[in-house]
Amino acid sequence: MADQLTDDQIAEFKEAFSLFDKDGDGCITTKELGTVMRSLGQNPTEAELQDMINEVDADGNGTIDFPEFLNLMARKMKDTDSEEELKEAFRVFDKDQNGFISAAELRHVMTNLGEKLTDEEVDEMIREADVDGDGQINYDEFVKVMMAK
């Protein structure tokens, strides 16, 4: 499954994996998964976290290692983001629910994920997605970026 990913995608997923893998031991635990999900405004129960881990935990050791994570991501990409998942993701970023993601909102979510970005990096991310040039990202622009990944 993961063999259909490009080198760029694998590098991106490696970066995402390290955001989850807080202690850097090469495995994601339910605790680490919970921390990241809560920082994104979700509130999963312990049982839900365990289910998520079990879904991809091929060797049954109770944690997700990078190859298992890659398989999960490859599967998720094949299902391509459903409209509902995209709306949910947009809502996570759009803190004030005004229909736009501002640079401040983008910075806030990325910082919660442990990703310290410079103002230039945040501005660059906005510029890449901001088709109409109004300095923020609307839902249509967000969908385009997410589908292009």
Swiss-Prot record:
Record: residues binding Ca(2+) 4: D130, D132, D134, Q136, E141
This protein's UniProt keywords: Acetylation, Calcium, Metal-binding, Methylation, Repeat
EF-hand domain residues: 8-43, 44-79, 81-116, 117-149
Binding sites annotated in the UniProt record for Ca(2+) 2: D57, D59, N61, T63, E68
Entry-linked Gene3D superfamilies: EF-hand
Record keyword Magnesium present: no
UniProt modified residues of type N6,N6,N6-trimethyllysine: K116
Any Pfam family hit: EF-hand_7
MF-aspect GO terms: calcium ion binding
Gene Ontology, cellular component aspect: myosin II complex
UniProt modified residues of type N-acetylalanine: A2
Binding site for Ca(2+) 1: D21, D23, D25, C27, E32
Binding site for Ca(2+) 3: D94, D96, N98, E105
Note: This protein has four functional calcium-binding sites.
Its biological purpose: Calmodulin mediates the control of a large number of enzymes, ion channels and other proteins by Ca(2+). Among the enzymes to be stimulated by the calmodulin-Ca(2+) complex are a number of protein kinases and phosphatases.
Family statement drawn from the similarity comment of this UniProt entry: Belongs to the calmodulin family.
Protein name: Calmodulin-3
Organism: Oryza sativa subsp. indica (Rice)
